Amino acid sequence: MLSAFEKALFFLLVAGTLGLAWFTFRWMFGAIRRGDGQLHLNELPRRVFRAVEVALTQRTTLRARPGTSVIHLFIVWGFVYYILINTGDLIEGFFDVHFFGDGRIGGVYRLLGDVLSVLTLAGVIYFLVRRFIAKAPALTFRENVPLHERARPGIRRDSLIVGLFILVHVGSRFLGQSFAIADRAGDPWQPAAGLVARLWSGLSFGTLETWSHLTWWLALGTILAFIPYFPYSKHIHLLMGPLNYFSRPDRRSLGALEPVDFEDDSREQFGAAKLEHLQQTHLFDAFACIMCNRCQDVCPAYVTGKELSPSALEVNQRFELKGVMRGLAAGEDSPRPLLDFAISHSAVWACTACGACVEICPVGNEPMFDIMHIRRDQVLMESEFPAELQGAFKGMETSGNPWQMSDSRMAWAAGLDVPTVDDTDDYEILYWVGCAASLEPRAQQTARALVQVLQAAGVKFAVLGERERCTGDSARRAGNEYLFYEMASANIETLNEVAPPRILVTCPHCLHTL
């Protein structure tokens, strides 16, 4: 048990370290609140359950890299259990009690602590070896990917600090248990610590007590020393990852974008040119990022050698935010545009908007949406976009399709006796054909085959015919939200007039938009 002086010292250290961390967290969440939109906190019970379930099961992590993910799972369980262990050690330090006692419950408590300590230590050693000795390619970025000036050395330094913190914290506590076991001549509930305790069999009672006392301070002292650094470290994902799942928007589909209110006369910025223009949930993403690069593994642009890395985008924003979050929280503007530090102009237009990065992220980050918002700024505010898109935008605006083709949208149906909504009211399905199936010869085969299936099945259907226009999804993904807004408004008017019972589509762009 601690002396009165040690108890007072501990309280002072706790107050100091929590005070320092409080200022950082206040700046962090103040910077996040500078973003556009809001964090989503509706249906709290469901959101809390989702956050806890994802954190404890690690199901989103286990979707890729199964071996590494299982090791990470043990570390997570160890971290969660160590909240209980540290609470117990704190109580034992301040009061002359044995946490959970010496009975069966206390035995199970110590057994789980013993097993999880070993698994955690082994897991952290594995990850340190993987990063610093094996230098796993999955944890690196290609040289052509733009990185924040502080990112490349910062990632390695931060990983080392976090790894050593866990080793010292868990290792000190584990050694402390071995000294205590040697002091009381064994504990069958702690087999691993018991093996280490044999090394101390020749030490005196006083020496064992001293080392047990020192390791108590070392184990809990490392936490106190780490807490002020915690908000700046990658370890912050332990808090921000579950909170990200807790506060992220509920999307009806993987790539569903937030609409822009063009009727709001007070709005001066469309899209994201600077950090504070991003959605609040996407600023949250930067702090939740684990820097595992799983999104990079599945990014088709990165795999084919482009400058785009979804992981680098989040990492770059994270390092910039760490430097400017105090000013952002105070109401200042961020000093640099996103294209100066977060992502290159080439990388912005390399994204295919496939959503693979969103689907794979263990903590629910959405780097694809950051890119979509940057594109909105480039198109709507700066009129900067690849020349190839000019023709597509013009085609969607004037011809109702991205290829500027003036062909009939019913040419594909020649000889099939396909009814339009102007021909009949007796139909149960409106087949939305889409631009490709209407105008592109290979895709027309899909439309014809589907119609033949519907006719053979006796399904009553109709198409819009010449009234059908592109849904504008390609314009939206390319950042031209206003063109999409105009096209969507026209399509909504048409659909409200027709009022179809059900809609059938074969185009994924049409599906997402409708």
Locate each region found by the language model.
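Iron-sulfur-cluster electron-transfer modules
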Residues: L2-I133, H277-A286, A312-E314, L321-L514
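Alpha-helical membrane-embedded segments
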Residues: L13-A21, T120-V124, L167-V168, T210-F246
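Juxtamembrane inter-helical linkers in multi-pass membrane proteins
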Residues: I32-A55, K135-G154, P188-W200, L239-E268, ...
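A conserved hydrophobic secondary-structure block that centers on an alpha-helix together
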Residues: V115-V118, G123-L167, G171
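Membrane-interfacial helical/loop segments at transmembrane boundaries in membrane proteins
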Residues: I91-V108, F141-R150, S178-W211
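Juxtamembrane/interface segments at transmembrane-helix termini
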Residues: A21-H40, I91-F95, Y126-F141, L175-W189, ...
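Hydrophobic alpha-helical membrane-insertion segments
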Residues: L73-L84, L160-R184
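Ferredoxin-type iron-sulfur electron-transfer modules and their immediate structural context
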Residues: H213, I227-C351, S399
